[in-house]
Amino acid sequence: MVLTDIEYLLSYLEAHHVPTIKKKRHTYLTYHGLAEHYTYVLKDGIIKNSIILQDGREYNLSYIAKPDVISLLRDEVSRSTDQPFNVRIESEYATFYQVNRVAFWKYVNSTPELQNYVKNYYRKKLSENILRLQRMVMNGKKGAICAFIYSLVDLFGRKVNEGILIDFVVTNDDIAGFCGISSRSSVNRMLKELRTDGVITVKNHKFIIQDVSYLLDQIAN
């Protein structure tokens, strides 16, 4: 059986007995700007990446809900590097491989399969960042919220009788943080409009998307 890039990385770390750490919900793995000696690889769980803006507001970047390297930014040789963003645990627990960052790059430079993973990682992150920027610039508040809700389908969506259940609790504050909206009341108002229009409903604090095409119609591409 041919392994995917991330499956190969996980099996490689297991074979080299790389230690793991476990963190509880709403604790932080790293903070933006903190000097860090390790590279972390999410083994299981859900995390959220964010940065703090100059005005003190938190701007959310992404959820990560499947195994992946948390950050490969910066150079390969320094024993420590400043972390590019905050990493907060959003599931009950999350488990990470904790790899000395210099050792990690030695693994990569000596293993073609890991080199391929790193190349694909950077391509994927660049593509995600460009798409996120496009949606922020080209959409108003409602379009940004519709784009964000639609993005949750791939991460947490599953089919139910009523539509597509987003099987993860996302708060209005989180939505505001992902969409660059400073007023929580704006999020509340637009979510109410979407419920009134039959686009979404809420059950047990989770969204059910009833009209995906409406969301897509609101997103500028």
From Swiss-Prot:
This is Lactate racemization regulatory protein. L-lactate acts as a positive effector on the binding and multimerization of LarR on DNA, while D-lactate antagonizes the positive effect of L-lactate. One of its GO terms (molecular function) is DNA-binding transcription factor activity. It comes from Lactiplantibacillus plantarum (strain ATCC BAA-793 / NCIMB 8826 / WCFS1) (Lactobacillus plantarum). Residues 139-213 form the HTH crp-type domain. It comes from the Bacteria. The lineage of its organism: Bacteria, Bacillati, Bacillota, Bacilli, Lactobacillales. Keywords: Activator, DNA-binding, Transcription, Transcription regulation. It holds the Pfam family HTH_Crp_2. Induction: Induced by L-lactate but not by a racemic mixture of DL-lactate. Makes part of the larR(MN)QO operon. Residues 172-192 bind DNA. Signal peptide: none annotated. InterPro entries: cNMP-bd_dom_sf, HTH_CRP, RmlC-like_jellyroll, Tscrpt_reg_HTH_Crp-type_CS, WH-like_DNA-bd_sf, WH_DNA-bd_sf. Multimerizes on DNA. Multimerization is required for transcription activation. Positive transcriptional regulator that is absolutely required for the expression of lactate racemase (Lar) activity. Controls Lar expression by sensing the L-/D-lactate ration. Binds to a 16-bp palindromic sequence (Lar box motif) that is present in the larR-larA intergenic region, allowing transcription of the larABCDE operon. SUPFAM superfamilies: cAMP-binding domain-like (SSF51206), Winged helix' DNA-binding domain (SSF46785).
